[in-house]
Amino acid sequence: MKSIRQLLSLAKKEKKREKKSNHGSHSMEWESPPSYNEIKSPSAPIFGYDYEDMEYLPTLGVQTLKLQYKCVLQVRSESPFTSYLDAVDNVANWEKQYNGFSGKKPFYRAVMVRAVQAMKANPMSLQDGRSPEYTSEIEGRCLVFHSLGHIPPMMYMCEQFTRDWSGRRNQGIVNVKIWVGVTDTLDNLDQIFDPKKHFSEEEMLSAATILGLEVKKSSDNNYIISKSY
C-alpha cells in the first residue's frame, strides 16, 4: 500500500503533465480561486433585473422628482411628547420591520417629517390621566431633490403600517396610512423640506436624520436627500 506522501507526489507529477499537455491551448485555467472581493455575476439570471443599471447608478447625480403625497397619522403614547423632535423620535418606529415598497421608503420618510410636525393632540385624551392621542392628515404635491440613484416608477397608492413601540421613556402605538406617487404636473411646486414650517432649519434637518435621511443643503438653497439609511 502506498503512503500518503507517495500519493501526493504522484498527484503533483500528474498535474505537471496536464499543464504541459494543455500549454498553448485557449482554455482558461484558474491557478487559484477568485478572491473574496471579486464581484461575479450570479450563475442563474434574475428575472427583470437589468445589470446595466448598476453601471450608471453612481453617475446619476442630483435628480428632481415631482411627487403627490397624502399621509394620515394616528399615534397613542403612554406619556405626552415633550417636543417635536421627541415626537419624531418615537413616531420613527412606524417603519420597524418595514415590509413596504423599498423604492418609496426614502420619500415616505420625507413626508413623515412634515406629517409629525402637523400632529395635534386630542383634548379628550389628555383628561383623567388617559394615554394621549395625536392625529394629523396632510396631502399635497411637492418637489424632491435627491442623489439616491435609480428610482423605480412609483404609483400613487396607499400603504398602511401599524406598529407598537417601547422605549426608555415612552411607549405606544403608531398607525400610518401613506400615499406617494410621481406626478407629471407642470406647476411650480415647493420643496418637501421647508424650514419655514419648522422652528428652525436645524430642527428640520435633525428630524430628517432621526427618520433615517441624510439631507444636505446646496448652494442654491435646495435640500437634497443624499442618503437613506
UniProtKB/Swiss-Prot annotation:
It is found in: Virion; Host endomembrane system; Host nucleus membrane; Host nucleus. A motif (PTAP/PSAP motif) lies at residues 42-45. It is a peripheral membrane protein. GO terms for biological process: viral budding via host ESCRT complex. GO terms for cellular component: host cell cytoplasm; host cell nuclear membrane; membrane; viral envelope. Homomultimer. Interacts with viral nucleocapsid; this interaction contributes to the virion assembly. Interacts with the viral envelope glycoprotein; this interaction contributes to the virion assembly. Interacts with host RAE1-NUP98 complex. Interacts with host NEDD4 and TSG101. Interacts with host dynamin. Interacts with host NDUFAF4; the interaction inhibits viral propagation and is independent of interferon activation. Interacts with host GTF2H5; the interaction may inhibit host transcription. It holds the Pfam family Vesiculo_matrix. Keywords: Apoptosis, Host cytoplasm, Host membrane, Host nucleus, Host-virus interaction, Membrane, Phosphoprotein, Viral budding, Viral budding via the host ESCRT complexes, Viral matrix protein, Viral release from host cell, Virion. Phosphorylated by host. Transmembrane segments: none annotated. Forms a double layer around the helical nucleocapsid, the inner matrix layer binding to the N helix and the outer matrix layer binding to the envelope glycoprotein. Plays a major role in assembly and budding of virion, by recruiting cellular partners of the ESCRT complexes that play a key role in releasing the budding particle from the host membrane. Condensates the ribonucleocapsid core during virus assembly. Belongs to the vesiculoviruses matrix protein family. It comes from Piry virus (PIRYV). Signal peptide: none annotated. A motif (PPXY motif) lies at residues 33-36. This is Matrix protein. It comes from the Viruses. GO terms for molecular function: structural constituent of virion. Residues 11-36 are annotated as: Disordered. Its main location: virion. The keyword Membrane applies. The gene is M. Late-budding domains (L domains) are short sequence motifs essential for viral particle budding. They recruit proteins of the host ESCRT machinery (Endosomal Sorting Complex Required for Transport) or ESCRT-associated proteins. M contains two overlapping L domains: a PPXY motif which interacts with the WW domain 3 of NEDD4 and a PTAP/PSAP motif, which interacts with the UEV domain of TSG101. A motif (dynamin binding) lies at residues 2-4. Residues 13-23 have a biased composition (Basic residues).
